[in-house]
Curated annotation (Swiss-Prot):
Subunit and partners: Component of the eukaryotic translation initiation factor 3 (eIF-3) complex.
GO cellular component, one term: eukaryotic translation initiation factor 3 complex
Entry keywords, A to Z: Cytoplasm, Initiation factor, Protein biosynthesis
GO molecular function: ribosome binding; RNA binding; translation initiation factor activity
Cited Pfam families: CSN8_PSD8_EIF3K
Disulfide bonds: none
Species of origin: Emericella nidulans (strain FGSC A4 / ATCC 38163 / CBS 112.46 / NRRL 194 / M139) (Aspergillus nidulans)
InterPro entries: ARM-type_fold, CSN8_PSD8_EIF3K, eIF3k, PCI_dom, Transl_init_fac_sub12_N_euk, WH-like_DNA-bd_sf, WH_DNA-bd_sf
Gene Ontology biological-process entries: formation of cytoplasmic translation initiation complex; regulation of translational initiation
Record-given protein name: Eukaryotic translation initiation factor 3 subunit K
Residues spanning the signal sequence: none
Similarity annotation: Belongs to the eIF-3 subunit K family.
Length: 250
């Protein structure tokens, strides 16, 4: 069972106090939340509830919006996929930033804004991760210098995403071709892959066959289980059905 979205073990006491009271709607707390986003980027934590509170303040006070803070929040949300965090954050942004503008005016505004371009590029990355197109995610991330600029403030971004991908792979597979896994994790060579899967994931590398295979230990997600359901239907149940049929006919 996942952790509730309003919970965060690393949340400072002053942030907890703001979120628990009416000050969460006070525009003066915007700078406090912004500093907290910077802290999250530096110490590799993520507080979705606090970040949503900041985006809600931006929604009510558009003049306070800081594009860099918003993009940092979105980048941090990428590091906790698969989760609704990115979609929730995206939904609180101005309509003209959305990947699919609903009007010509919004489309025109989107074309003229670097901020909108950044948001939509990050939305593209989120879509690739959520749809498990991991190789395409890395190639897209490496295809444009703007992506490098967007993730620069988030310490360990690639490592955090790589670990999340490994977690998802471990849920779905018992063994994976090493060359395929290299592409999914964006590691440069077989030595780097072997180090990652053995030291970080505690998986095994099998080189005995014609192709190197990475073996994932059995867990409750990837274990093949046959599900057998048995239902007992008594004669009295049939009797009620037949009797009801005659009653309706009458």
């Amino acid at each position: 069972m996942g952790v509730a979205i309003d919970k965060c073990e690393t949340r400072p006491a002053n942030i907890e106090a703001i979120l628990s009271g009416l000050d969460r709607y006070n525009p003066e707390t915007t700078t406090v939340f912004q500093d907290y986003v910077v802290q999250q980027c530096e110490d590799r934590t993520f507080d979705c509830y606090a970040n949503l509170a900041l985006l809600k303040l931006y929604q009510f006070n558009p003049h306070l919006l800081q594009p860099e803070t918003v993009t940092n929040i979105l980048v941090k949300a990428l590091t906790v996929f698969p989760s609704p965090a990115f979609s929730l954050c995206l939904a609180l942004l101005p309509a003209y930033t959305q990947p699919f503008p609903s009007s010509e005016a919004e489309a025109t505004a989107a074309q003229m804004s670097d901020f909108v371009e950044s948001v939509q590029k990050l939305a593209r990355l989120s879509s690739l991760l959520e749809s498990a197109q991991y190789a395409q995610f890395w190639s897209t991330l490496n295809s444009d210098d703007l992506y490098a600029d967007l993730v620069a403030d988030v310490a360990g971004f690639e490592e955090l995403v790589r670990i999340r991908i490994a977690v998802e792979v471990g849920k779905a597979f018992r063994e994976v071709n090493a060359e395929v896994l290299e592409q999914w994790l964006d590691v440069r060579n077989s030595e780097a892959l072997e180090k990652f899967v053995t030291e970080v994931c505690s998986w095994e590398v099998d080189k005995s066959g014609s192709a190197t295979v990475v073996k994932v230990p059995t867990n409750k997600e990837n274990e093949a289980r046959s599900e057998v359901k048995s239902e007992r239907v008594g004669v009295d149940m049939f009797g009620r059905v037949i009797r009801r049929g005659f009653e309706q006919a009458a």
